[in-house]
Amino acid sequence: GQAKLWRQKNSTVFAVLLIAITLNFIVTPTYAKNTELEGENYAPSSSSFQKPANVHTKNDTDTVGYFLGGGIQNSFNKESYPAFSGDQPLYTPYRSGFRFLGWYSDAALHKQIKTIPTDRKDHYILYAKWTAKINNYYNVEYYNYHKRESRFDKNLVLLKDLDYSFYNEIDIPGMPDTREEDVLKKYIFSASQCPQGICLTDEFVLITSYSTEDDCMGELMVFDRETGEYMVTLGMDENSHLGGIAFDGDNVWVCNSYENCVERISYDFIELMAYQNTGDVVDARDVVDEFPVKNTPSCITWYGGRLWIATHTLLVNSRMVAYYLDKKTDKLIALSDYKIPQKVQGVTFDDSGNVYLSTSYGRNQSSYLYCYDSVTALATRPKHPRKKVEMPPASEELDVSDNTLYILFESAGEKYYEGTDGKGKSLFPLDKILKIPIRELDVNGSSTSGT
């Protein structure tokens, strides 16, 4: 009798459990639906549920945490953004005595992030990367010059012993201090810039630069000469090194070593873009005329009605060829060929015919400025300049204007400053245009005036 009673009780319990389980499968989904629980909220904490794309509530947000590393936050950087509101830009914070190098998504500062994606609900932790600001005067004064060599070479002087200065009015886009903002403002096409060429006109300072990123246009950047204000960027051939730039009074000439040619751009066009498209980036690749040349165009200058185009070599003497523009055929005619020192990066003349060469190779090897009395003196004794100036590494092109020599450096470009190519970092970078009065060089014993 007890066994029968036990079986009846257990049958009753089993029936109740069966009814409860059945109701759980029927009632619970209905309850969830009626209370408008979304799948993400309804799923247990151990669930791997992922919300389908573009399915979200009006309260969904992407949250962001910032590690500023001693800096002060930019008020435009928010701690939350509405989900699915598009990529949100990141802005530059401030830290006294330091330059901001970007936001990173990992504490090791390897994975840079330039925008916050909001295509799904997420939480981001970002880390600010900093580096000490470049002190140009310090890097000139405390560079490790070859002092022993200067004692034995009476024609060699050190830059720190000259009355030099910097063109502080111009902030070159792509330099560490402004790199991130320059990209946001679209002054440049990428943050990976290598400044190459410089040319001065009455109205403007023109600077060329290439990007180390693939398929990214190079730049011809235009600045107001008096104020240093950035005016406009002209997009150039993405494959070109853009090693040099020159002005002949009517046109601007730019080196294109990739095509083994020089490109001509009307100065009127540059002037028009600078004043009517101020602050813009203009693709100028279709408005240039190409002129093939017989030597690889590494750098260029205009003097005496001729284009002087030099080729960079590493171990043997370089060469420089003078070209004449035949206006009837609109072709460049090679006239004279000259031997010049290796490692040439820039060439220019002053009004008296004195020649100045910028030579360099390597981010931690000295640059040298060579000064000659004439092109004949250069051609006959290329390794024996009248005066030689040792400078910090990575000098590029140079130009003469108003009794002053202007020299551009690439050592603060991302590839060298950050060592992104794996070949080390530049230890004494310069991010401003160097200025040396012609009288300091005293090539032929008298002050001269350049253009």
Segments from the language model and where they lie:
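Secondary-structure capping and domain/repeat boundary segments
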Residues: 35-135
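Conserved blade-ending motifs and adjacent loop-strand segments that build the rim/top face
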Residues: 379-401
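Structural motif
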Residues: 215-220, 260-268, 316-324, 364-373, ...
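Beta-strand-rich domains and repeat architectures in extracellular enzymes and scaffolds
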Residues: 182-215
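Loop/turn-rich, solvent-exposed surfaces of beta-rich toroidal or solenoidal domains
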Residues: 338-377
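Repeated scaffold domains used in trafficking and secretory/extracellular systems
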Residues: 192-197, 239-246, 292-302, 341-348, ...
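Surface loop/turn motifs at the tips and blade-to-blade linkers of beta-strand repeat domains
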Residues: 186-191, 234-238, 288-293, 336-341, ...
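Sequence/structural signature of beta-propeller modules
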Residues: 134-185, 429-451
